[in-house]
Amino acid sequence: MDPASIWGNRWINSNQSIAKKYMETVCKKQSLVVLAADKKTMNELNKLIDDVGDYISALKTHVDLIDDWTKEGWRDFVTKAKEKDLLIFEDRKHGDIGKIVREQMGGIYDSKSWADLITAHSVSYTHLTLPTKRIV
């Protein structure tokens, strides 16, 4: 499926790389599904990718809810998600001034390095440039 023929004017008029990436992924996988990956362990997250990764377009994660989180384990999870052509949507809802939010996107979880999208409250939006790859 060609994104331009499926999405029409949305594709043509979009100037956001993440929107186009999502539309391309949807067309490739023939799925609009963004699955809330509200799991508590790395094993549960990895099993979720094994079970449904071929049938969804994106995972919405909460990295700070993972009880057994390690940098290496999360890196392996991200690699596995990318191998399945999944976008990763980190649901953080950052809501501070831009400088603080940028620092929060680094930190122990370093979400700016692996998330395709990160949620933020509108109080922050004027100080941030999305998608996350442009923040730093």
Label for each model-derived stretch:
Residues D2-E83, L87-F89:
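Conserved N-terminal beta1-alpha1 strand-loop-helix module at the mouth
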Residues H127-V136:
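Single conserved hydrophobic/aromatic residue that forms the stacking wall/gate
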Residues T41, D91-H94, T132:
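Short, glycine/acidic-enriched loop or turn micro-motifs at the edges of active sites
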Residues D67-T79, I97-E103, S122-L128:
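Active-site-adjacent beta->alpha loops and helix N-cap segments on the catalytic face
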Residues L86-S122:
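Glycine/small-residue-rich loop that forms an oxyanion/phosphate-binding "nest" at active or ligand-binding sites
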